[in-house]
Amino acid sequence: GYHEIFICEMGARRVGEIKELCDIASPKYGIVTSVGPQHLETFKSIDNIIKTKLELANNLQPGGAAFINADNEYLRDNMPAGAVTYGTREDAAYSAVLKSVSSSGTQFSVRYPDGSIHDFTTQLVGAHNVTNLCGAIAMAHYLDVDDKAIYDGVCRISPVPHRLQLIKKPGMIILDDAYNSNPSGCRAALDTLSRF
């Protein structure tokens, strides 16, 4: 069959691994979602993590674009030239605003670079998921995906088991974030819980 878009995650445990993956996949577009201390054991320093994550932005095909999370201070302070920014900051090219989080999901809006505002609803919960979705929305819009298709896609996304998964039982709601927690993930889960 014919495919228009191939999406893959590029994870790494050492400097140079994302460049190696770029040499194989030859991406034209890339999203860098975050840099944090959760990988310090293998990378030894935040600078090594930043360098490795930005290997994606620095190894895109000509004419491509890097989408960078402007909410992440490490990425913001090391922003590649020409990057398309996204996040909850007002100065991001694609700027998201969280409207509500409940056991039914999350409502938010995204301001596009042309100033238009688009409302979204997702089954995912948590402010961090709004930032992640904003990156996907930014790239989809940049690639001229139809607005309705973007909206419908965001609505259809369902939680991955054990990653801030809401489980509703009679008389209770369970927020299951047991997959592979780290300090920033735990903070995100507690922040989400505090919004209920």
Report the location of each language-model feature.
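Conserved substrate/cofactor phosphate-moiety recognition/catalytic segment
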Residues: 1
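Switch II (G3) loop of P-loop NTPases
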Residues: 4-15, 174-180
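Short glycine/serine/threonine-rich phosphate/pyrophosphate-binding segments
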Residues: 14-18, 130-133, 183-186
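Amphipathic, non-transmembrane alpha-helical secondary structure
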Residues: 19, 23, 54, 58, ...
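Inter-motif core of Ras-like GTPase G domains
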Residues: 20-36
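Alpha-helix C-terminal capping segments
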Residues: 23-24, 138-144, 194-196
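Acidic, Mg2+-coordinating active-site environments of NTP-dependent enzymes
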Residues: 31-174
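AMP-binding/adenylate-forming catalytic core of the ANL superfamily
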Residues: 49, 181-196
